[in-house]
Amino acid sequence: MSFEVFEKLEAKVQQAVDTITLLQMEIEELKDKNNQLAQEVQNAQGSREALEHENHQLREQQHVWQERLQALLGKMEEV
């Protein structure tokens, strides 16, 4: 009788150990995925900053061209 109880207890302990091992593996996978996603976020932020800078430069260029065009149109009206 006590041998059967010991076997059941041993099986439950082994099941708990197996579950813990699987959960530890899952935690490691999730940590790796989290690190990968954090890197992707950093890359996206860098790309965003570069695009914002480019957008700012293009807006400035557009403003300069609009001023030149307005000046040319003003000269054409004078003629």
Curated annotation (Swiss-Prot):
Annotated function: Non-essential, abundant cell division factor that is required for proper Z-ring formation. It is recruited early to the divisome by direct interaction with FtsZ, stimulating Z-ring assembly and thereby promoting cell division earlier in the cell cycle. Its recruitment to the Z-ring requires functional FtsA or ZipA.
Subcellular location: Cytoplasm
Subunit structure: Homodimer. The ends of the coiled-coil dimer bind to each other, forming polymers. Interacts with FtsZ.
Coiled-coil zones: 4-78
Major place of residence: cytoplasm
InterPro entries: Cell_div_ZapB
BP term (GO), one: FtsZ-dependent cytokinesis
The keyword Ribonucleoprotein belongs to this UniProt entry's keyword annotation: no
Lyase listed as a keyword: no
Protein name per its UniProtKB record: Cell division protein ZapB
NCBIfam families from the UniProt entry: PRK15422.1 (NF011951)
Family classification: Belongs to the ZapB family.
UniProt KW keywords: Cell cycle, Cell division, Coiled coil, Cytoplasm, Septation
Superkingdom of origin organism: Bacteria
GO terms under cellular component: cytoplasm
